[in-house]
Amino acid sequence: MTGPIDTPLGPGKEFDRIRAMAARWGARARGLGDDCAFLEAGGERLAVSLDLSVEGVHFTREWLAPAEIGYRAAAAALSDLAAVAAEPVALLLGLAVPAGESDDTVSQLADGVADAAADCGATIVGGDLSRGPGIVIDCCVIGRASAEVRRRGARPGDRLVVTGALGGPLAALLEWRAGREPPPAARERFARPASRHAAARFLAAHRARAMIDISDGLAGDLRHLLAASGVGATLEVERIPVLPDAAKLAARLKEKPWSFAARSGEEYELLVAVPADEAAAVVAECPVPATIVGTVEAEQGLRATERGAAVRLADGFDHFGTP
């Protein structure tokens, strides 16, 4: 693709704004649109990404301890490295806190970031600290991209595979908003997202053609992967793996579990397109649970079926979409 966006983005106001910025930048930018930027340095191929976590948008203090806030913010950034199968190496931390914030809170935020980095083999190598109206955590992550997998590359006939079980973060969010403490498994999925770096390297070794981490919901991020690859897909929604806690809450809300799971964001599980002849081995041998959920097709657009009958999927999360 010509212009600064190498990898086309899916629909949404947030991504319209990114496209508009890229158009204004023109030749002053390059390589935009994927989970990471790729740079050559000292003979190595590096993957670099940056992720913000903002108080009142991504978390509130009523829900999480400071160390959990820090851990979650860093894990979200590091997940971008997993999305391209890069090995985490380094993290730079930008942190803003209110002027009257306690030293203990700042220390716990920093400890959470350090723990998330250490859990996947990255080292904190620098950062910045500032005053602000609320907590903002900005993590820049760097990894070795020896087995680079991007969002683009899915081909007709490929099978779509998702790691883990979905719905936990949305279940936790809705329970907190209702004034209830979430079930432990759902809370853990929200507060301490699991690292999927080993799974990402396994998937890359099994000829993964395209990959993305699920941050805006399975439905939304699948649309991004399809747009990047210039293909379409059918998602077999009854195959979507659902966390039991999420399925229970969906039943209380009179929503189908697959629908609940498909719109749950900030999962940080992996969605990958693999050749059909690799799909069975991927599911059987992946170091974390993995499930085939659909098939890539030549006809563009996302279609969803439940046991063969067409169904509608919710849109993915959009920071500037309609509430």
Q: What is each stretch, according to the model?
A:
Residues C139-R150, P184-R201:
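Active-site glycine-rich loop that binds ribose-phosphate moieties when present
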Residues A29-L32, A47-L50, T123-G127, V141, ...:
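General beta-strand structural signal in soluble alpha/beta enzymes
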Residues T2-A20, L64, P98-T123, S130-I137, ...:
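Glycine-/charge-enriched secondary-structure boundary and capping motifs
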Residues P66-A90, D111-D119, R201, G220-L225:
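Small-aliphatic-rich amphipathic alpha-helix that forms the alpha element of a beta-alpha
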Residues G3, G43, S53, P88-L174:
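Glycine-rich anion-binding loops of enzyme active sites
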Residues L170-R187:
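Short, compositionally biased
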Residues M1-A65, L93, A116:
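Extreme N-terminal cap/leader segments of soluble proteins
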